[in-house]
Regions:
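Conserved phosphate- and dinucleotide-binding cores of soluble alpha/beta proteins
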Residues: 91-204
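N-terminal active-site beta-alpha-beta segment that forms phosphate/nucleotide-binding
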Residues: 9-123
Length: 204
């Protein structure tokens, strides 16, 4: 086995171990607690300059083990924001307008509620809110390992915010050369920003 493949194997093992640790912590955290944390996270985001300026926002329709978004997404839609959700197409994510929970379809490979309708170009987005298995102090993100968000984020330059419960914020997430940190990380107890883009996320 080459040095490169050995290094990759060790990295994959470390990512797998971290995902397993977070999974155990999630199983010990009631949904009601995660909902309280979600309310705190999204209330924080709604005070940020980037949120106040953005009209077209990509979020995610949360799975049972993710920071809950259903209530917030519906509230934002009612408040007049243009909300978009991801839809899996092959190895990539399409960006589709969200018109309400009744328009979602979970008849797909991952049984995720996905919006129906025509996809739009990601260039219309002004803010992306990203789920994570784990986030770290350097704004690195660990996902589920499929690479969907990695590919999406590499194709857009709009501001990105990673959100998670407090226990999902760790000292260090294993990264690879092609990984790029998010612009901002928000938990119920922390805001971590790129200093050069701090003006987008911190009220002056």
């Amino acid at each position: 086995m080459s040095c490169v493949s050995k290094k990759q194997l060790m990295l994959d093992m470390t990512k797998k171990e971290l995902r397993q640790q977070i999974k155990q912590l999630k199983s010990m955290t009631p949904l009601a607690v995660r909902q309280v944390e979600a309310d705190m996270v999204f209330n924080t985001i709604k005070t940020m300059p980037v949120w106040l300026q953005a009209q077209h926002i990509l979020c995610y329709w949360s799975l049972p083990d993710e920071l809950p978004t259903h209530e917030s997404v519906n509230n934002w839609l009612a408040e007049g924001k243009s909300i978009y959700l991801p839809r899996v197409k092959g190895d990539d994510l399409e960006i589709v307008p969200y018109h309400g929970a009744e328009s979602l379809d979970d008849n797909n490979k991952f049984h995720i509620g996905e919006p129906v309708g025509d996809a739009v170009d990601s260039s219309c987005l002004e803010l992306i809110i990203v789920p994570a298995v784990a986030l770290d102090q350097n704004r690195n993100r660990l996902g589920r390992g499929k690479g969907f968000y990695d590919r999406l984020l590499s194709s857009t330059s709009c501001p990105t915010i990673g959100v998670a419960c407090e226990f999902q914020l760790v000292d260090e997430v294993p990264v690879e050369p092609h990984d790029h940190p998010l612009d901002c990380v928000v938990t119920s107890d922390a805001i971590i920003t790129d200093e050069e883009k701090r003006y987008l996320f911190m009220a002056q």
